[in-house]
Amino acid sequence: DASASNYDINALCDDGSCTYPSPFVSLHVETVDNSVGNFANGEVTYRLYAELNQDSAKITQFYADETRPHLIATTTTFFQDQYGADVQDQITEAFVGSPLAPTLAFDSWITIGDAYTTVQNAFVINAAAWGFPLFNGTTGPIDWTAGGTVNSDVALMRPPDNLECLPDANNRVLLGQFTTS
């Protein structure tokens, strides 16, 4: 395969030994202006992006398991709007920016790509293991975890042909939004 790091033009067959460079560069955190939400306790909204090194790279999934856990933590609680959801594309897009739900745009959620409503929704595998009730701004604990214990495998995936898997103009793919005070 000519795109492999160890490509050998003289190779006569594919022996499965090709290695490929990772398109992943880093994680990037950005603060979102949430002043229209009229929060009273100094809440701040953050967006977490994966930065990639090429516009044709894509992220189709992220997962956690027994040896590779995920943890997103705060010293307070995560904000969860009453019309919100734990995965961005499960939020009703028509409510975002509506006077009926002025803080919905600042809900805490995970995603792959930036779309409230997509043709192909993200698939959550083993949803019970995500511990989504932890995204609860009124009574919830201060962290969100996945993986790290026996039989805690969990994944969020999109089909590889889903446009949400591709990076934006800054070569970033949105992974989540988290509002906390």
Regions found by a protein language model. Name each.
Residues D1-S181:
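Primarily marks secretory-pathway-exposed extracellular/lumenal segments that are disulfide-
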